[in-house]
């Protein structure tokens, strides 16, 4: 990559980070202005268009980055699990760390999941589906269950995790610790339920084949 391309990528990165920094519990992406983001990034508003077509393209890039960041962290968690440790507890801890370190990234996913923009809703749905698919892949590999079972289990787990994540954004450290424990219990109940449901279905098949 040449010097000019590196500088362009650096400026593009600055715009993304500037937009993230302006999000908060009180401020959504829809309330951001191009001028504010450009000023925070240290560039002229007219220079913004060298990097993004419009503010919506910037927002969609932020959604993609947020989803990718979360998936990468969860992959790292699964690598740690491979070396020993509780699958569910390690995953929950990693997820809560992500929210603690990147609250605005998670807020963006939550808000735009049910926002007014169809493009944003589709982008968030796509990221969540990636998340579900990767978890289903892992469960299928580890638990040796059919894809239909692991997808249903993964979808239930992700739904509960995202709901807990929304709650975690606005509570203190002790409440978050209690939330983590509750989330671990809920996910274990889903995992146990999926396993016993699968066992029951297998027993039915075996009985019919006799």
Swiss-Prot record:
Entry-linked InterPro entries: DesT_TetR_C (IPR054129), Homeodomain-like_sf (IPR009057), HTH_TetR (IPR001647), HTH_transcr_repressor_FabR (IPR050692), Tscrpt_reg_HTH_FabR (IPR023764)
Single annotated GO MF: DNA-binding transcription factor activity
Cross-referenced Gene3D superfamilies: Homeodomain-like (1.10.10.60), Tetracycline Repressor, domain 2 (1.10.357.10)
Keyword Transcription regulation on entry: yes
UniProtKB keywords: Cytoplasm, DNA-binding, Fatty acid biosynthesis, Fatty acid metabolism, Lipid biosynthesis, Lipid metabolism, Repressor, Transcription, Transcription regulation
Gene Ontology process terms (BP): fatty acid biosynthetic process; negative regulation of fatty acid biosynthetic process
Name this polypeptide is given: HTH-type transcriptional repressor FabR
């Amino acid at each position: 990559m040449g010097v000019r391309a590196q500088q362009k990528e650096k400026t593009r990165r600055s715009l993304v980070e500037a937009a993230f920094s302006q999000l908060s519990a009180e401020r959504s992406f829809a309330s951001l202005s191009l001028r504010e983001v450009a000023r925070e990034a240290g560039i002229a508003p007219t220079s913004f268009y060298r990097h993004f077509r419009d503010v919506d393209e910037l927002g969609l890039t932020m959604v993609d980055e947020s989803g990718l960041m979360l998936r990468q962290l969860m992959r790292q968690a699964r690598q740690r699990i491979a070396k020993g440790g509780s699958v569910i507890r390690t995953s929950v801890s990693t997820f809560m760390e992500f929210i603690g370190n990147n609250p605005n990234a998670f807020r963006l996913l939550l808000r735009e999941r049910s926002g007014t923009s169809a493009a944003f809703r589709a982008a968030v749905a796509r990221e969540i589906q990636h998340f579900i698919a990767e978890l289903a892949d892992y469960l299928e590999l580890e638990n040796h269950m059919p894809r239909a079972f692991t997808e249903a289990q993964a979808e239930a787990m992700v739904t509960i995790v995202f709901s807990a994540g929304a709650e975690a954004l606005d509570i203190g450290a002790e409440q978050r610790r209690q939330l983590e424990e509750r989330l671990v219990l809920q996910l274990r109940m889903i995992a146990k339920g999926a396993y016993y449901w699968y066992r029951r279905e297998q027993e039915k098949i075996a009985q019919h084949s006799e």
